Amino acid sequence: MEADGAAAAAAAGEASTEAGARPLAPEEEALRRNTDCVYFLASPLTCKKGNECDFRHSDNARMNPRDCWYWLNSNCLNPKCPFRHPPIDGMFGAPTTGMPAVSSHYAPFNSGKQLVPCYYFKKGNCLKGDRCAFYHGPQSVGNNPSEQVVKVSSLPLEQLQTQKNDLLGIKDSVQSTNSIQHGAPITNERGKTAVDRSTVNSARTATVAIPVASNAMSCPKSEKVKSSTPAALKESFTTSSGGDHPECYQNHFPMDSDPVRDWNQSYEMPPADDLPQNSREADELLGESSPGFDVLVDNDADGAAYLHDEDFGGDMYPVEDYEYAPADFDVRAHHERERFNGMDEQDQMGHMYDGYERKRRRSSERSMERPFHSERRFLQRDRDRVEMDGSDLRHRLRRRRINESSLAISPERNGEQRRRDERYRERAHGHRSHRDHHQSSRGSTLSSRLQGRIKLPGRSPDRVDTRSEKERDRRRLRDRLSPVRRTEFQGTRHREAGQHEEQTQRRSSELALGSRNADGQHLTKDVPDSHNFPHRKNSRDSSKANGSVEPEASLDFEGPKPLSVILQRKREAAWANGTSACSPKQDKSAEVSHRQASLAEAEKEGDNIISSDEYKSGSGDEEFRDEGHIPVEGHGQSSSHGDKLEAEDIIEVDPVENQDADNYDQREGESYYEPIEGQDYKSDDENAYEDDDEEYDDDDDFARKVGVVFS
C-alpha cells in the first residue's frame, strides 16, 4: 500500500510538471480540482502550497481511508465527497507503471454484493465502504445488470479472495461467505425446502452475502427491516411439526430461477390461511368496514355522512330536549323510559331529564343496532307530514314557554305537571289530535296562570297587623299634639275655637296651684338628678320662636310616681276638667290677671323658670319619658339652666279637643294632673261631675300604650 501511494504521488508530481509546461484544458483542470492532494492526505502540513494547491484538500477524505467508487469509475459529481479521490491512470496523459488497473482491482468487490443499491452510497457517505453488503455502483440505464454480473463472475473466486486479502484484509468476511455457500439444506415433513438453522444464524452475523455464481441470493436481516416488500423473493411461513406459532420466518426461492428476473417480478401476497390470526377475524387485518357500508351497497350514498356523524345520527333537529319524532319511535320503550324517569309520579325532575335519557338511550341503540336503525331511519322520508304535526317544534317551544311561566306563579304546578304528562302519553298513543291537545293545553295553562295570580301569596298577616297598629298609634299621637303646633305647622284650624276656651279654663286652675306652691307649700320629697329629667329651656325657646309666648310660673318638680297614683290623678284631672268646662266666661279676665301677677313674682324669686307650655304647650299637659320612667306632669322644679331638653323626650298632649277627643284620650290612658305624695289634691272648682270609671280601670291597657309610644 505504501508503494502504491508513493507511485501515485510520483505520477501526480510528473503530471504537475507536465501541466506546467503546457496549458491544461478545462476538463483536465476540473479533474485536477477533484483529485486529492497526496501530500495533504499524508498530513496537512506537508503540502507547502496550501490554498494555492491545484488539487483537492478535503479533511473528510483525509480521515476516511476508503476510496470513492464513483471516482474510480470516472463519474463522481459530488464536489464535497467524503471519500478519497486518488489519482487515476491516464488522467494526466502519462500512465503509471507498477500500479494495477483500477477496474481489475475494484470489480471483484461487486461480485458478492446484492443488486440492491446502497442508500448511503447514493448520498455519498457510506462508512462501510467495500464491506457494505449492498451494491455500490452507478445505476446504469442501458446496460443489463445480468451481463455485468456474468462478467464479474467470470474471474476465479480464489483470485478474487487473494486480491481482497492483499488490498483490504477482509479474510473474515470471505470465510463467512464460504460457510454460507457450503451450507446444506434440509427438508421437513411437508416437503418444503428450508435453510439449516446454523446456516441462518451464520447468515445473520455475516455482513457479506452469497456470491452470484451460486445462483442464489439472500436478503439480510437489516434489509428485511427496511423494505416492507422484499423484491425477487416469495416468502412462505413454515412452522415446526405440530406447532401453533412459527419459530422463524424463512426465505425460500427456486434454485434454478434467474434472480434478476425474480427481482423484477411483483411481490405476491401469501395466502390468508398461512397468516397468523391471533384469535382475530381475517377482516380485522384489513381494517373494520364502514358502518354505512350496507347502505352504500344499496346505492344510498347520500346518507353516508349522516351515518358517520354520531351527534347528528340520533336526533334529526334537536332543540334542547325537544326534537322531531324519529321514524323508529317505539311506544313501549317510550313508556318504559317514562316509568324509569318517574313520569307517572309527581316528579318534575324526571320530566326535565327525560330528553337526556332519550338521547343517551338512542346513542346506545345506535351503537348496538346501527344497520337496522339506519334502514328504518331512511324510511322516515316517506312518512306523511300530517303524522308529525303533533311534534311540531314551534308548538313545543310555545307550550314549553307557557308552561314555564305558569309553573313560576301557580301553586298547583304539581297537579298541572301530572295532567300535562298524561296528555303527552296520550298523544304518543295517538288517541288525541294535535289541535285538541293544543287548545286544552292553552286553556289549562291560562286558567292556571289566572289562578296563580289570584292566589298569589302576600305578606304575613302578623307583620301587616303589627305595622298597621304602629301606624295607628303614631297617628293618634300626632292628633294629640298641641293646637299651637298644629296651627303653625299643619294648618288645621277646625277645632281652634273650642280648644281656646278649654285652654283658658285649665290655665286658671294651674295658676292657682302655682301660686300656692310659690307661697311656701313646697314638696318635701327629694328631687331626682338632672340627667334623669332634662331641663326644658329648649322647649321654652322653641315656643317663643313659634310665636306662642306664655306667662311663666315657678313650679316645683315632683319626680316619678307609681302607676296607681298616676291613674288616680288622671281620674281627678278628668273630673276637674269637667268642672272647669262648666265655669262661666266672665271669670276669665280675673284668672288671667291673677296668673300674670304670680308669674311676675316667680321671675323675681326663682332661678329655675319654666314655661307653662312646657308641661302644657297649648293644652296644659306634657308627658316626660326617660328610660322607663312614668310620665310626670308639670308641678316640678328644674335642676339647672344648663340642662338641655331633648325634643324626643317631650310629647305635648292635647287632652280635650272636643267630647270625642276627650273620650279618646281617656281611653288611651293619658294623665293630666298628678297629686303630691302625702298631701290631698284639691281643685279650685269642686263642682264636677263623675266620669265613667269603666274606661279607666284597665291599667294594663294604659301600660301597653305607654310602651307603644316609647317604641
UniProtKB/Swiss-Prot annotation:
Residues 1-21 have a biased composition (Low complexity). Keywords: DNA-binding, Metal-binding, Repeat, Zinc, Zinc-finger. It holds the Pfam family zf-CCCH_2. Residues 648-663, 686-701 have a biased composition (Acidic residues). InterPro entries: Znf-CCCH_3, Znf_CCCH, Znf_CCCH_sf. A zinc finger (C3H1-type) spans 31-60, 62-88, 112-139. Gene3D superfamilies: Zinc finger, CCCH-type (4.10.1000.10). Residues 364-376, 413-427, 460-509, 585-594 have a biased composition (Basic and acidic residues). PROSITE patterns: ZF_C3H1 (PS50103). The keyword Repressor does not apply. This is Zinc finger CCCH domain-containing protein 32.
